[in-house]
C-alpha cells in the first residue's frame, strides 16, 4: 500500500464529507466511513463518497449473532468496500460467518479493544487482565477464525504483528506528536504505528478539524 492513511470522514453532512475527501485525496490512501455516517446517509452516501476514487473502509463494527452479521455483510456486498469491521467479541462463529459472506475483494477485520478504553475500563467490564492482554487474546481468536486482520491500538500492533506475520492491521486513535488526545486513551503517533507494523493508519480529527486539512494531511504523510 503506497499511502496507508485512511481519512475518517466522520462528518454529519454528506456534501461536506465529499468536499473534504476531494481536497485531501492526493495525500491519503483511502476513506473511512463510520457508523454515524452510514446511519445518516446509507448506501447512497457510500456511493457518493466512492466517486472520489479512493478505496472505501466501512467501519461498521458489526456485532450480533452469526446469521445476522452474515446477512449484514451480504447487504453491503454491493458497495464493494475494501475493508469492513466486525467486533471480535462476537465470537469465532460470528467472525467465520462474516468472512464467508464478505465479497471476494473485501478485507474483514475484527475490532479488538476500542482505543477509547483502558485498563480501568477492562476492570469495570469484568474483563480479566489489561487492555493489552485482551487485544492479544481477541487477535489470536480472529486469526483462528480466518479473518484478514484486526483493529487495535498502536500499543498492541507490534506484538500482534509478531504473532500474525501476514495479518492486516488497522490502527485508529492516532495523533501527531503535537496533537490533542481528545477521547483517545491509547493513542500513538502515525509513524510509531507504521513502524510497529500497521497496514492502515486511521486519522480523523487531526486532518478534518485542522484549519488547513490539506496541509495537515501533507504534514502527516511526510512523517511516514
From Swiss-Prot:
It catalyses: orotidine 5'-phosphate + H(+) = UMP + CO2. Pathway: Pyrimidine metabolism; UMP biosynthesis via de novo pathway; UMP from orotate: step 2/2. The active site is at residue 61. Keywords: Decarboxylase, Lyase, Pyrimidine biosynthesis. It comes from the Bacteria. GO terms for molecular function: orotidine-5'-phosphate decarboxylase activity. InterPro entries: Aldolase_TIM, OMPdecase, OMPdecase_AS, OMPdecase_bac, OMPdeCOase_dom, RibuloseP-bd_barrel. GO terms for cellular component: cytosol. Substrate binds at residues 10, 32, 59-68, 115, 175, 184, 204-205. GO terms for biological process: 'de novo' pyrimidine nucleobase biosynthetic process; 'de novo' UMP biosynthetic process. Its EC number is 4.1.1.23. PROSITE patterns: OMPDECASE. It is an enzyme of class 4 (lyase). Homodimer. PANTHER family: OROTIDINE 5'-PHOSPHATE DECARBOXYLASE. NCBIfam families: PRK00230.1, pyrF. Belongs to the OMP decarboxylase family. Type 1 subfamily. Catalyzes the decarboxylation of orotidine 5'-monophosphate (OMP) to uridine 5'-monophosphate (UMP). This is Orotidine 5'-phosphate decarboxylase. It comes from Novosphingobium aromaticivorans (strain ATCC 700278 / DSM 12444 / CCUG 56034 / CIP 105152 / NBRC 16084 / F199). The lineage of its organism: Bacteria, Pseudomonadati, Pseudomonadota, Alphaproteobacteria, Sphingomonadales.
Amino acid at each position: 500500500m503506497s499511502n496507508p492513511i485512511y481519512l475518517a470522514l466522520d462528518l454529519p453532512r454528506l456534501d461536506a464529507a465529499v468536499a473534504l475527501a476531494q481536497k485531501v485525496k492526493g495525500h491519503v490512501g483511502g476513506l473511512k466511513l463510520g457508523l454515524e455516517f452510514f446511519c445518516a446517509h446509507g448506501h447512497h452516501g457510500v456511493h457518493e463518497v466512492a466517486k472520489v476514487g479512493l478505496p472505501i473502509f466501512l467501519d461498521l463494527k458489526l456485532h450480533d449473532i452469526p446469521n445476522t452479521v452474515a446477512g449484514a455483510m451480504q447487504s453491503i456486498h454491493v458497495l464493494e468496500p475494501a475493508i469492513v469491521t466486525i467486533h471480535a467479541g462476537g465470537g469465532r462463529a460470528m467472525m467465520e460467518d462474516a468472512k464467508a459472506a464478505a465479497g471476494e475483494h473485501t478485507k474483514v477485520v475484527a475490532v479488538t479493544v476500542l482505543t477509547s478504553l483502558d485498563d480501568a475500563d477492562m476492570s469495570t467490564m469484568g474483563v480479566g487482565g489489561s487492555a493489552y492482554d485482551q487485544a492479544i487474546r481477541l487477535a489470536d481468536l480472529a486469526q483462528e477464525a480466518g479473518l484478514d486482520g484486526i483493529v487495535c491500538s498502536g500499543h498492541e500492533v507490534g506484538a500482534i504483528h509478531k504473532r500474525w506475520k501476514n495479518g492486516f492491521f488497522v490502527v485508529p486513535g492516532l495523533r501527531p506528536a503535537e496533537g490533542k488526545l481528545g477521547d483517545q486513551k491509547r493513542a500513538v503517533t502515525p509513524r510509531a504505528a507504521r513502524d510497529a507494523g500497521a497496514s492502515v493508519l486511521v486519522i480523523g480529527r487531526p486532518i478534518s478539524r485542522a484549519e488547513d486539512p490539506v496541509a495537515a494531511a501533507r504534514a502527516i504523510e511526510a512523517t511516514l
